[in-house]
Amino acid sequence: MLQPIGDRVIVKVKDEEEEKVGGIVLASNAKEKPQMGEIIAVGNGKRNANGDLIPMSVAKGETVFFDKYSGTNLKYEGEKYLVLRESDLLAVVK
């Protein structure tokens, strides 16, 4: 299992579904990168200037939105993930 370090989270990006516009199937390179996913692992948090640990404000299992250009793509055991810093997250679906 993957465990992120510091203020990072590992997100399983929602699968891209083929999109049809007016009956035309869009090519995969015409689609934008998904911006929504489920958190599968959360780091311990970030340390401030005094060395105190600031805990993460998100949790495993939450669905989040993120900027389409943020994070690092990662492939592990045949699955695709995205590693993001907590500050890259835009919103949590409640």
UniProtKB/Swiss-Prot annotation:
InterPro entries in UniProt: Chaperonin_GroES, Chaperonin_GroES_sf, Chaprnonin_Cpn10_CS, GroES-like_sf
Principal location listed in the UniProt entry: cytoplasm
A Pfam family recorded for this sequence: Cpn10
Annotated CDD domains: cpn10 (cd00320)
GO MF, any single term: unfolded protein binding
Subunit structure: Heptamer of 7 subunits arranged in a ring. Interacts with the chaperonin GroEL.
NCBIfam families in alphabetical order: PRK00364.2-2 (NF001531), PRK00364.2-4 (NF001533), PRK00364.2-5 (NF001534)
Protein name in UniProt: Co-chaperonin GroES
Organism in which the protein naturally occurs: Lactobacillus gasseri (strain ATCC 33323 / DSM 20243 / BCRC 14619 / CIP 102991 / JCM 1131 / KCTC 3163 / NCIMB 11718 / NCTC 13722 / AM63)
Gene: groES
